[in-house]
Amino acid sequence: PERLFDTRPGTPASGHKGKLGPGEAIDVEVLGHAGVPTTGVSAVVINLTGTEADAPGFLTAYPTGQSLPLASNVNLSDPGTTAPNLAIVPLGPDGAITVYSSHGTHALGDVTGYITDSTAPVSVEGLFVPIAPERVFDTRDAGGPVAPDGTIDQAIAGTGHIPAGAVGVVLNVTGVDAPSPGFLTAWPTGTAPPLASTLNFWSTPTDTRANAAMLPVGTDGKISFYVLAGGHVLADATGYYIGPEGL
């Protein structure tokens, strides 16, 4: 995952800074940013987050140049809320997306992948294979809770119906019994921790939150999970991606 934009002042991501006002929209350049190629891309996979909301509302992401759709990607239920959601957003003709806010809030987005267009060469690499949802790990069953500011490495490829040769997975990641507000980040084991978040805890102790994540697997088919406040982590797989040699 790599941060594409962040409206909070002082954050390293480029682009618009400052809260989005009620009914305000910003255009975010995608092609050539956050690991996305400059050509051959039709859509971006992005974890979109709203934070420090002034009032209940929602965020909607859509292709730049199109009309605002009757749809939402992230719903913010209370003032001060932080909430993420994974979205696949088509790009506009200029390679950008537009992010609209119904009420005042900061917004940020982390790229976790992209969808190629018809100009990409035909290949089995990157082919998605769906599976029936299955639990691949749960720290409540083994290992115990993650310590505050702690990281665990979990074998994902080769677990359950995910073959050892898979290069990426789609997970529903859940944090349970977080003792205080914070966030969880998942990334390929063996690579540097990214400036990104997978899900956020914001309300009360023992908060439970879940979010979808599309992730490459790292060393030995593992994915690392960092939890700022600590707590239990579990993940359910819903599919995987085929590598260059197929499976």
Q: Model-found features: residue ranges?
A:
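Short edge beta-strands and adjacent beta->alpha junctions
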Residues: 1-247
